[in-house]
């Protein structure tokens, strides 16, 4: 079509049935019409080649099959003979035939796995496979329950073999393999043998049985804790498999879980999808697949009728298609690969690695003091024997005494080595991951929990994250006439525009779309597609509610799907009357710039002059300033001789109209942004929308401030490194951005400004930025599978407020582990000092091996359980983030550790030296009573220090404690077992029952640690080492 320069050239109307027609021509050769003919490529050649064309070849093939005549009249017959011999070699198993199918699972899987074209030909190409699977390429499988069960029994389920669940006893055995516990076990056995030999049963067995019982208690608690964590992580792994896939079943398009896919399903794939099973290409356009995860080849592969093989686990980089599933689960190449890979769930997080270094250092210090303690304790008896000349004469009592000293030394190592550090990290991460799942965040990488707590910048998408992603067209400018959509005063909107413009607009919307209008089981229209496509299709139905009329006619022959680089989608239609028409839609400025004509208010095609162009740009700006997303729709009549092999033109279009789409800001986003700001986290908005829309939304969200800068991607890309260095600290909005712009910004923030960056992404092209960021956050609803695979955390509800919740939980994990480390180091220091100084000055250790093992369990397992599972509070988001270079053990922690250790050691030393006088203890029984009081006081010091450790800076440590059932349970359990240990298990724990007064004084000394801790917190220290002064807003 050509428009006149002067006057009105009327727009050619499309055929009535051509508006919505989306009939795609067959992309594979038709099946042979002659009985027994196989649709091999060789049978569809033009007449004159190979001795008489396809029909004669089919006839010869048929006669050959019936009469077994060994004649070779053509190449086609040769190929056919080979095919018949292959087919005759395949025998359908009886159980498969009985279930109503004509091909077994292994034969079917081998076709795609080996890309066996000959075998595919033998089975009748795509249509033959579909027939043998009892499915329809158009309508998919029938979902009758019995039929689905039969199909599942024959072909299997789409699940991979899971690693065998480790039993509880395996975790117990793993805990028993600890070197220090093995040494203690040997000591216990030796103690039992010597004790029973010298003192008889049961008196001689008390020490040994006590140590064994303590070891078993420690091992069982540790094993139970680790077993529970493994179950939690397995549940989280199952959540990762909850992927919805679009299929056609019973002729209806619907979503099913990836695990429910079966061979015979017709699956719809689009850009960013991960291929959910092995299968064959049915139809589609421009399908480009990344097979590197399977083949290692970095070059993407085109999938079409000539190369119809789609492999599970590969990713769709471009285009869209429909696929016939042929193999699922462990019969796919991906499933077989998964079977030979080891479970990677045991990788340590960065914080665990750092803490292992701390644990090793403390362990070496503990070993040094343990050796010294053993030497000091043993030198008395050994020295005396040397003086008496009895070095070679040892009684059972002498051996037991040395053994006791050795057990104390080994137990000091057990106490000193903080095995609880990695346990605390794992516990805290497991607890946080489970709670975050309830808060709509799926953690894919454990390290993300820690890192998110240090985040200083969040780079967020707009659509669906800051906004609701529930889009509707609220304004439209067609033929220069702007209307309010859904206005009660204009019920028949199409009457506002020329008929020819409405028909062209409908043709554009219904054909140039990745969405689809289908009829659901209730007979009502249902729209499937992205929120943008849904909004446009709803608008089209409002203009002309009868979609059925527009289902036939034009054929889609070429599609260029939308991507964030081109910011447009284009389609070529083959018209019923001949010729081709291109339709294009996308970012308003970009598509309008590609137009040189437009449809005026009379329905005429007129040149797009500067005045009209300026007017349309003003409309775009007006829509955008109202926070509306704008799309421009245009078309172009293709010249005679156009070939579908050519590229879709980028210029020469006729503007049909502009629509304004409302995507409301999510409730609570403004408050969440304010929370981030108070927490020292700056929020940047990165969007593909134009700058006016972006600024309006950013102001509404509270992201764009008076001093902030909003900039477009094109301008951002032109900046030099020096200019970016000055710009980025003030930049709060990046509009019309490409994925490369996002990647560049994230890289600069991390390297030049040393920020810890969290970035959101939903598209395939966002994968580089998600990997570049410290924390990649993918959208669970709008996000593609490629984006989710590249992310550390999946935001299941696509809500910005959930991102803030993840940041809060990340800080909680980090702070909880700091609390535990502070608590544990205090116990370590005091236990070492008490036993070492007592050994040096009195020749005895007041804390025995059994007692130290009990303290170790309080400190390691129970302490980790209590402090590492503290839920986050709002105060966490009122402090500055730790950042990339923040110290883990801060000055605040050292202040608390030193202050509390000095108090506890002073109490222990006072009781050691003045305890007998204080309690009036005399006689042979005085030592064991005093040692029991020291042990009891020491334990209660840890109980109350555990409460004080709930807050490292705040004095009010009781806030929220009543609501923390785990913490209260640990405290109650510790006190209960301490009472049992002291009052009733004295023979095993080297204790004796205490009086009420002695209990009260022990508890009082422990309680006094709380006001002492509060007073220590009043001592001002620098909370963190000074961070970078060059912070972004």
Swiss-Prot record:
UniProt cross-references to InterPro entries, sorted A to Z: ATPase_P-typ_cation-transptr_C, ATPase_P-typ_cation-transptr_N, ATPase_P-typ_cyto_dom_N, ATPase_P-typ_P_site, ATPase_P-typ_TM_dom_sf, ATPase_P-typ_transduc_dom_A_sf, HAD-like_sf, HAD_sf
Membrane topology field: Multi-pass membrane protein
GO cellular component: intracellular membrane-bounded organelle; plasma membrane
Catalysed reaction equations from the record: Ca(2+)(in) + ATP + H2O = Ca(2+)(out) + ADP + phosphate + H(+)
Keyword Cell division: no
Superkingdom of this protein's organism: Eukaryota
Subcellular location: Membrane
Any matching Pfam family: Hydrolase
Name the UniProt record assigns to this protein: Calcium-transporting ATPase 3, plasma membrane-type
Source lineage: Eukaryota, Viridiplantae, Streptophyta, Embryophyta, Tracheophyta
Encoding gene, per UniProt annotation: ACA3
């Amino acid at each position: 079509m050509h428009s006149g320069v002067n006057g009105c050239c009327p727009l050619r109307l499309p055929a009535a049935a051509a508006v919505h027609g989306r009939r795609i021509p067959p992309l594979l050769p038709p099946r042979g019409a002659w009985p027994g003919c196989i649709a091999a490529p060789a049978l569809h050649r033009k007449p004159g080649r190979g001795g008489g064309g396809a029909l004669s070849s089919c006839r010869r093939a048929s006669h050959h099959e019936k009469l077994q005549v060994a004649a070779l009249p053509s190449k086609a017959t040769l190929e056919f003979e080979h095919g018949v011999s292959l087919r005759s070699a395949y025998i359908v198993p009886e159980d498969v035939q009985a279930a109503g199918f004509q091909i077994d699972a292994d034969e079917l899987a081998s076709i795609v796995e080996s890309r066996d074209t000959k075998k595919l030909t033998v089975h009748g190409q795509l249509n033959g496979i579909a027939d043998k699977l009892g499915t329809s390429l158009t309508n998919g499988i029938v979902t009758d329950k019995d039929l689905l069960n039969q199909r599942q029994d024959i072909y299997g389920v789409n699940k991979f073999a899971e690693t065998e669940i480790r039993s509880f006893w395996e975790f117990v055995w793993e805990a028993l393999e600890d070197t220090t516990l093995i040494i203690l076990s040997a000591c216990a056995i030796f103690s039992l043998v010597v004790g029973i030999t010298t003192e008889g049963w049961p008196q001689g067995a008390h020490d040994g049985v006590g140590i064994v019982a303590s070891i078993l208690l420690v091992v069982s608690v540790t094993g139970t804790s680790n077993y529970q964590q493994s179950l939690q992580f397995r549940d989280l792994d199952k959540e990762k498999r909850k992927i919805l896939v679009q299929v056609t079943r019973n002729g209806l398009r619907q979503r099913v879980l990836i695990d429910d896919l079966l061979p015979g399903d017709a699956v719809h794939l689009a850009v960013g999808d991960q291929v959910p099973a092995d299968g064959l290409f049915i139809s589609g356009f421009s399908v480009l697949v990344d097979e590197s995860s399977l083949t290692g080849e970095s070059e993407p592969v085109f999938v079409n009728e000539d190369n119809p093989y789609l492999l599970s686990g590969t990713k769709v980089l471009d285009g869209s298609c429909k696929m016939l599933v042929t193999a699922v689960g462990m019969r796919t190449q991906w499933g077989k690969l998964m079977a030979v890979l080891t479970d990677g769930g045991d990788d340590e997080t960065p914080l665990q690695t750092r803490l292992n270094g701390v644990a090793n250092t403390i362990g070496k210090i503990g070993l040094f003091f343990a050796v010294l303690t053993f030497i000091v304790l043993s030198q008395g008896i050994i020295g005396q024997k040397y003086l008496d000349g009895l070095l070679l004469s040892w009684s059972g009592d002498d051996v037991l005494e040395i053994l006791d000293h050795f057990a104390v030394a080994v137990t000091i190592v057990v106490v000193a080595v903080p095995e609880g550090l990695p346990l605390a990290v794992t516990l805290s991460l497991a607890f946080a991951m489970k709670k975050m799942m309830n808060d709509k965040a799926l953690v894919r990488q454990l390290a993300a929990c820690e890192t998110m707590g240090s985040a200083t910048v969040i780079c967020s998408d707009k659509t669906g994250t800051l906004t609701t992603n529930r889009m509707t067209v609220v304004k439209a400018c067609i033929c220069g006439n702007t209307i309010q959509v859904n206005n009660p005063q204009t019920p028949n909107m199409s009457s506002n525009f020329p008929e020819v413009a409405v028909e062209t607009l409908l043709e554009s919307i219904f054909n140039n779309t990745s969405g689809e209008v289908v009829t659901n089981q209730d007979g009502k229209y249902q729209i499937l597609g992205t929120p943008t496509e849904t909004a446009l299709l709803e608008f089209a139905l409002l203009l002309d509610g009868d979609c059925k009329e527009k289902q036939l006619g034009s054929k889609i022959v070429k599609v260029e799907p939308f991507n964030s680089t081109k910011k447009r989608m284009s389609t070529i239609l083959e018209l019923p009357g001949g010729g081709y028409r291109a339709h294009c839609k996308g970012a308003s400025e970009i598509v309008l710039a590609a137009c040189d004509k437009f449809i005026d208010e009379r329905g005429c095609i007129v040149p797009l002059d500067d005045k009209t162009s300026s007017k349309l740009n003003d409309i775009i700006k007006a829509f955008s300033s109202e926070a509306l997303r704008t799309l421009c729709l245009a078309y172009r009549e293709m010249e005679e001789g156009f070939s579908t092999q050519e590229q879709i033109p980028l210029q020469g279009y006729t503007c049909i109209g502009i629509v304004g789409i409302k995507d409301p800001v999510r409730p609570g986003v403004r408050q969440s942004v304010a929370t981030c700001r108070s927490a020292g986290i700056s929020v940047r908005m990165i969007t593909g929308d134009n700058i006016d829309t972006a600024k309006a939304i950013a102001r509404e969200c509270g992201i764009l401030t008076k001093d902030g800068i909003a900039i477009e991607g094109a301008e951002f890309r032109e900046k030099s490194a020096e200019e970016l260095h000055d710009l980025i600290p003030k930049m709060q909005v990046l509009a019309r951005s490409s994925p490369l712009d996002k990647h560049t910004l994230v890289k600069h923030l991390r390297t030049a400004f040393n920020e810890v960056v969290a970035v959101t992404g939903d598209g395939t092209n966002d994968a580089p930025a998600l990997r570049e960021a410290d924390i990649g956050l993918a959208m669970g609803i709008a996000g593609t599978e490629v984006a989710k695979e590249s992310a550390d955390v999946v935001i299941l509800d696509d809500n910005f407020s959930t991102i803030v919740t993840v940041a809060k939980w990340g800080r909680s994990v980090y702070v909880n582990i700091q609390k535990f480390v502070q608590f544990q180091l205090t116990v370590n220091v005091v236990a070492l000092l008490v036993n070492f100084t007592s050994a040096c000055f009195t020749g005895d250790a007041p804390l025995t091996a059994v007692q130290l093992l009990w303290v170790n369990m309080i400190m390691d397992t129970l302490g980790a359980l209590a402090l590492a599972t503290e839920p986050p509070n709002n105060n966490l988001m009122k402090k500055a983030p730790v950042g990339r270079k923040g110290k883990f053990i801060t000055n605040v922690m050292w202040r608390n550790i030193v202050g509390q250790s000095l108090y506890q050691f002073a109490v222990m030393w006072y009781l050691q030296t003045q305890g007998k006088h204080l309690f009036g203890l005399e006689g042979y029984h005085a030592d064991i009573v005093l040692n029991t009081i020291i042990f009891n006081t020491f334990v209660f010091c840890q109980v109350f220090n555990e409460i004080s450790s709930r807050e490292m800076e705040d004095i009010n440590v009781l806030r929220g404690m009543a609501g923390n059932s785990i913490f209260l349970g640990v405290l109650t359990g510790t006190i209960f077992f301490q009472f049992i240990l002291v009052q009733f298990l004295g023979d095993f724990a080297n204790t004796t029952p205490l009086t009420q007064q002695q209990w009260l004084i022990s508890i009082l000394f422990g309680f006094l640690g709380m006001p002492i801790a509060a007073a220590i917190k009043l001592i001002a220290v620098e909370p963190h080492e000074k961070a970078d002064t060059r912070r972004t807003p």
